[in-house]
């Protein structure tokens, strides 16, 4: 990656803490970027923290923007997430499958629950873990209080969601859906090698090759 001689610049304060800024020297002058915007120019997207609607909207927007910039060049999605909302995660998943560029996924830290589903949803042959990361799959969580008939409706819905998520994991791993249902019945933690053997990822990366 050529950052054209960036230097450490001012630091932006956000609600999430400190975000480093980089100064880029070009023939047209000097420009400053927050580090995530600069990496977006290299087609790198970060999915970090709880999966919820606002974060999902940002990730979807970045995926669509990078497709419009170059529909034939890979997008790199770095994941460090404990999971979160199923509907928010599915909006990211569907967009990953919808757009033309391959989306390469990389687990840094952890990819749990919906984070694990998005990790395995990357393009075949382009799903990675770093050596000390971890992956966790399980069934969706839910709870509801109210009239018995409403509880019955919500029970049917969460069972339907459970089956859909198992279908997705089965599709991307090649595992029979019956096996996936058993393996997601409780929290199922995996190290990178176990995740690779299961088919959730394709490779464990120790060093950047290029």
From Swiss-Prot:
Q: Where is the active site?
A: 113 (nucleophile), 138
Q: Which GO terms describe its molecular function?
A: ATP-dependent peptidase activity; ATPase binding; serine-type endopeptidase activity
Q: Describe the subunit structure.
A: Fourteen ClpP subunits assemble into 2 heptameric rings which stack back to back to give a disk-like structure with a central cavity, resembling the structure of eukaryotic proteasomes.
> Catalytic activity, per the record?
Hydrolysis of proteins to small peptides in the presence of ATP and magnesium. alpha-casein is the usual test substrate. In the absence of ATP, only oligopeptides shorter than five residues are hydrolyzed (such as succinyl-Leu-Tyr-|-NHMec, and Leu-Tyr-Leu-|-Tyr-Trp, in which cleavage of the -Tyr-|-Leu- and -Tyr-|-Trp bonds also occurs)
UniProt family annotation:
Belongs to the peptidase S14 family.
Q: Please give the function described in this protein's UniProt entry.
A: Cleaves peptides in various proteins in a process that requires ATP hydrolysis. Has a chymotrypsin-like activity. Plays a major role in the degradation of misfolded proteins.
Which InterPro entries has this protein been placed in?
ClpP (IPR001907), ClpP/crotonase-like_dom_sf (IPR029045), ClpP/TepA (IPR023562), ClpP_His_AS (IPR033135), ClpP_Ser_AS (IPR018215)
Q: In this record, what's one Pfam family?
A: CLP_protease
Cellular component aspect of the GO annotation: cytoplasm; endopeptidase Clp complex
> What EC number(s) does its UniProt record assign?
3.4.21.92
Q: Kindly state which keywords UniProt assigns to this record, in alphabetical order.
A: Cytoplasm, Hydrolase, Protease, Serine protease
Protein's cellular compartments: Cytoplasm
Encoding gene per record: clpP
| Name this polypeptide is given | ATP-dependent Clp protease proteolytic subunit
Q: Name one process (GO BP) from the record.
A: protein quality control for misfolded or incompletely synthesized proteins
Gene3D superfamilies, per the entry: 2-enoyl-CoA Hydratase, Chain A, domain 1
């Amino acid at each position: 990656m050529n950052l054209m001689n960036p230097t450490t610049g001012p630091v932006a304060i956000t609600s999430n803490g400190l975000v480093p800024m980089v100064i880029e020297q070009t023939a047209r002058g000097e420009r400053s970027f927050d580090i995530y915007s600069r990496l977006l120019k290299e087609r790198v997207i970060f999915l970090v923290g709880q999966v919820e609607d606002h974060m999902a909207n940002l990730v979807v927007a970045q995926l669509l923007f990078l497709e419009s910039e170059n529909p034939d060049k890979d997008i790199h999605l770095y994941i460090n997430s404990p999971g979160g909302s199923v509907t928010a995660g599915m909006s990211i998943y569907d967009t990953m499958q919808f757009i033309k560029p391959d989306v390469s996924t990389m687990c840094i830290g952890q990819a749990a629950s919906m984070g694990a589903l998005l990790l395995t949803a990357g393009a075949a042959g382009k799903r990675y873990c770093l050596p000390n990361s971890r992956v966790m799959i399980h069934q969706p969580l839910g709870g509801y209080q109210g009239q018995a008939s409403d509880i019955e409706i919500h029970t049917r819905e969460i069972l339907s969601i459970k089956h859909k998520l198992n279908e997705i994991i089965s599709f991307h791993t090649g595992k029979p859906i019956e096996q996936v249902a058993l393996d997601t019945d409780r929290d199922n933690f995996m190290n990178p090698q176990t995740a690779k053997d299961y088919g959730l990822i394709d490779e464990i990366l120790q060093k950047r090759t290029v």
